[in-house]
C-alpha cells in the first residue's frame, strides 16, 4: 500500500475501528506448493481482539476467522503446516507472514469536474479515486485437526463470537441469533469442515485517501459534488472528505 503522508493514518485505534466496522477482510498468502497457486486470496469475516500491552498501550491486535476446508487456499495452508510438522516443528504457526486487507464501507471515482477552484483556473486536474483501507501483516496460526480439542475449542469460540459480532454490530438485533439456536450435531458437523485461523498482527497500516491533498476550494467542490449525488455513499464520502480536510488543516 502506498502510504503518502497526507493520507496515512498512524493511530492504531482508528485503524482497528475501521476493521471492526468493516470486518470482511481479504486474506492473501504466498505459499509454495506443487498443487496450488503461489498467491491466493479469500474474503473472510474476522473478529479483532486488541488487548492492552503490559505498559497499558494498545496492541496491534489479533485477527480470528475460519475458512472452508475445501477452499484451495485452506488446502495450501494445511499442506504447509503438515510439511512443517513432518520436519519436527510442532507449532501451529507458519513461518511466512500473511496479509489481510480491509476496505472502508464506501469508495468512489472523483471526477475533475469536482475541482471547482483549480479546473477553471489552470485545467491541471485529473481523475482519481477516494477510499479508506487498512492492511494487517502477521504470522498465521492454523487450527485444522478436527480430532484436536484445541482446534474444536478455538472454532466454537470463533463462530460464536463472530456470529454475535455480526448479529449485534451489523444487524443491530437486540435479540440476536446464536450458534446455540442450531442443533449441536449440525454445528459439530460444520466445524469438521472448516479450519480456524489466527493472525497476530505485527504491522498495522492504513490510509484515508479523501482529497486531503487538495486546497480548500477544491475540497469544497469535492464535498458538494459528492453531496449532490444524492446517494448514501456520496453523503458518507462527503463527510469524510470534510473531516479529513479539517484534520489536515489543524496540523
Swiss-Prot record:
The protein's name in its UniProt record: Uncharacterized protein AN0679
Gene3D superfamilies cross-referenced by the UniProt entry: Electron Transport, Fmn-binding Protein, Chain A
Family: Belongs to the PaiB family.
Lineage: Eukaryota, Fungi, Dikarya, Ascomycota, Pezizomycotina
Organism per entry: Emericella nidulans (strain FGSC A4 / ATCC 38163 / CBS 112.46 / NRRL 194 / M139) (Aspergillus nidulans)
Pfam annotation, one family: FMN_bind_2
